[in-house]
């Protein structure tokens, strides 16, 4: 059997504390929805920069150099 350490006991108590439990109600859905919206906004901004429909002053996009 392995040796018990203070760090191992601490990590075990943190890691297994919520295993198998389901949070009642909405849980983490609002947090995940917010993160999803942020990701969507980020992707739309990238698409607009790629299509040059988002005009940025002093920033030129040259995709010919990217290979």
From Swiss-Prot:
Membrane topology, record value: Single-pass membrane protein
Q: Which InterPro entries match?
A: PSII_PsbH, PSII_PsbH_sf
One GO term describing the cellular component:
photosystem II
Recorded GO molecular functions are: phosphate ion binding
Report if keyword Thylakoid is assigned.
yes
Question: Record's PANTHER family?
Answer: PHOTOSYSTEM II REACTION CENTER PROTEIN H
Extract one GO BP annotation from the record: photosynthesis
Q: What is the role of this chain?
A: One of the components of the core complex of photosystem II (PSII), required for its stability and/or assembly. PSII is a light-driven water:plastoquinone oxidoreductase that uses light energy to abstract electrons from H(2)O, generating O(2) and a proton gradient subsequently used for ATP formation. It consists of a core antenna complex that captures photons, and an electron transfer chain that converts photonic excitation into a charge separation.
Give its localization. Cellular thylakoid membrane
Tell me, in one coarse class, where this protein mainly resides.
Answer: membrane
Q: Name one Pfam family in it.
A: PsbH
NCBIfam families according to UniProt = PRK02624.1 (NF002728)
Q: List the disulfide bonds.
A: none
Q: Which family does it belong to?
A: Belongs to the PsbH family.
The record lists the organism as: Prochlorococcus marinus (strain MIT 9211)
The source's superkingdom equals Bacteria
Segments spanning the bilayer are 27-47
Q: Which UniProt keywords apply?
A: Membrane, Photosynthesis, Photosystem II, Thylakoid, Transmembrane, Transmembrane helix
How would you summarize the oligomeric state and partners of this protein? PSII is composed of 1 copy each of membrane proteins PsbA, PsbB, PsbC, PsbD, PsbE, PsbF, PsbH, PsbI, PsbJ, PsbK, PsbL, PsbM, PsbT, PsbX, PsbY, Psb30/Ycf12, peripheral proteins PsbO, CyanoQ (PsbQ), PsbU, PsbV and a large number of cofactors. It forms dimeric complexes.
Q: What is this protein called?
A: Photosystem II reaction center protein H
């Amino acid at each position: 059997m392995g040796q018990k350490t203070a760090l191992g006991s601490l990590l075990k108590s943190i890691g297994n504390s919520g295993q198998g439990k389901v949070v009642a109600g909405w849980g983490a859905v609002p947090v995940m929805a917010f993160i999803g919206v942020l990701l969507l906004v980020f992707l739309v901004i990238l698409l607009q920069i790629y299509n040059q429909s988002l005009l940025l002053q002093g920033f030129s996009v040259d995709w010919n150099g990217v290979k």
